[in-house]
Amino acid sequence: MEKFTVLTAIAAPLPEANIDTDKIIPARFLKTTKRSGLGVHAFDGMRYNPDGSEKPDFVLNQAPYRQAGILITYDNLGCGSSREHAPWALLDFGIRCVIAPSFADIFFNNCFKNGILPIRLPREVCDALMDDARLGGNGRLTVDLERQVVIRPDGAEIAFEIDPLRRHLLLEGLDDIGQTLQHEGAIDTFEATRERAQPWQTRIVID
């Protein structure tokens, strides 16, 4: 998983609450187990017409938001089903940080597991950041995870809270497997010791 330290990126304003996971990635695209290739389908129903053409009024179809790395929205982002494909689609599009007043719990957790930083900020702060984002390329935001601040285009800083362990894992680029592999030596030692001390627990299958 890619480390998250400091991100300076175009932010896309999406002033809508209760965006569920089916809006983020519709169910018909969940057949794949690959994390790549889903970005083109992110917000599919909001981005495209039935004939597949783009809806020009949707923010991610507009320059410069096609290159957005930050998404700002309203309450309860990621509600609905618990599909992990939702953060996969956002990440494959290029989104590394989502900012909202609140998130659905499972989506919130899945973001961390996939290298996306979800930040909770009050509604009025999200409104102010959306105003910044509407400046387009001149409204880039910086998210400094090490210092736990969002830096606005005018240099003003907004502090945010994050669980210390989750902060550490993002800074180090560690997902669940990477976190486990940090203890690989201790696991190998335990397994070797267990086999010697309790050999009856090791099954030997003879054809």
From Swiss-Prot:
Q: Name one Pfam family in it.
A: Aconitase_C
Q: Which GO terms describe its cellular component?
A: 3-isopropylmalate dehydratase complex
Going by the UniProt record, its keywords in alphabetical order are: Amino-acid biosynthesis, Branched-chain amino acid biosynthesis, Leucine biosynthesis, Lyase
| Pathway where this protein functions | Amino-acid biosynthesis; L-leucine biosynthesis; L-leucine from 3-methyl-2-oxobutanoate: step 2/4
Q: What is this enzyme's EC?
A: 4.2.1.33
Recall the GO molecular function terms of this protein's record: 3-isopropylmalate dehydratase activity
Leading EC class: lyase
Catalytic activity as recorded in UniProt: (2R,3S)-3-isopropylmalate = (2S)-2-isopropylmalate
Q: Identify the InterPro entries for this entry.
A: 3-IsopropMal_deHydase_ssu, Aconitase/3IPM_dehydase_swvl, AconitaseA/IPMdHydase_ssu_swvl, IPMI_Swivel, LeuD
Would you say which domain of life the source belongs to?
A: Bacteria
Q: Which GO terms describe its biological process?
A: L-leucine biosynthetic process
Q: What are the cysteine partners in each disulfide bond?
A: none
Q: Which family does it belong to?
A: Belongs to the LeuD family. LeuD type 1 subfamily.
Self-association and partners: Heterodimer of LeuC and LeuD.
Q: What does the record give as the function of this protein?
A: Catalyzes the isomerization between 2-isopropylmalate and 3-isopropylmalate, via the formation of 2-isopropylmaleate.
- What name does the UniProt record give this protein? 3-isopropylmalate dehydratase small subunit
Phylogenetic lineage:
Bacteria, Pseudomonadati, Pseudomonadota, Alphaproteobacteria, Acetobacterales
Q: Which gene name belongs to this protein?
A: leuD
